[in-house]
Amino acid sequence: MAHCDFVTNSLIQNATATLHTNRGDIKVALFGNHVPKTVANFVGLAQGTKEYSTQNASGGPSGPFYDGAVFHRVIQGFMIQGGDPTGTGRGGPGYKFADEFHPELQFDKPYLLAMANAGPGTNGSQFFITVGETPHLNRRHTIFGEVTDPDSQKVVDAISTTATDGNDRPTEPVVIDSITIS
């Protein structure tokens, strides 16, 4: 078990996640050196190596958790949110974990990847990517990555301006086909 933890810790220190969506790829630099537990959770769910007790986005009990999930909430000028296997905004992996804040990570620019939650200590699988400065979220949501690639930022911007219904749900599904970690 210690060897597995070492491999995981080595991987998350400088990991990059690529969200392959039906609108294009979004490459995210993960902050494993600042928020290792949050990054390990995301990487484990993305790769299907972390246990969860609900069905994943593909409807199965195991394997990559996010494959087939949608961005279920999009608010222009604010953020795009995904990671819920049910696509409703109420789903998750069947567990919750504590917030992990780092003083160097602040919502002072766009394109930050952070955990969505329903209050302190309620992180699970849902995440969002900001499209503007959102300082009111500081110390409320764990920042664990950043979209730094200009082409990926264009994909985020395009998703953030997609047509939505009255519940901020895209009228045409924005699907996360898969996530690769490198």
From Swiss-Prot:
One of its GO terms (molecular function) is peptidyl-prolyl cis-trans isomerase activity. It catalyses: [protein]-peptidylproline (omega=180) = [protein]-peptidylproline (omega=0). Residues 161-182 are annotated as: Disordered. InterPro entries: Cyclophilin-like_dom_sf, Cyclophilin-type_PPIase, Cyclophilin-type_PPIase_CS, Cyclophilin-type_PPIase_dom, Cyclophilin_A-like. GO terms for biological process: protein folding. GO terms for cellular component: cytoplasm. Keywords: Cytoplasm, Isomerase, Rotamase. The keyword Nuclease does not apply. Its EC number is 5.2.1.8. It is found in: Cytoplasm. It is an enzyme of class 5 (isomerase). Residues 13-181 form the PPIase cyclophilin-type domain. Gene3D superfamilies: Cyclophilin-like (2.40.100.10). Pfam families: Pro_isomerase. The keyword tRNA processing does not apply. PPIases accelerate the folding of proteins. It catalyzes the cis-trans isomerization of proline imidic peptide bonds in oligopeptides. Belongs to the cyclophilin-type PPIase family. This is Probable peptidyl-prolyl cis-trans isomerase A. It comes from Mycobacterium leprae (strain TN). The lineage of its organism: Bacteria, Bacillati, Actinomycetota, Actinomycetes, Mycobacteriales. The gene is ppiA.
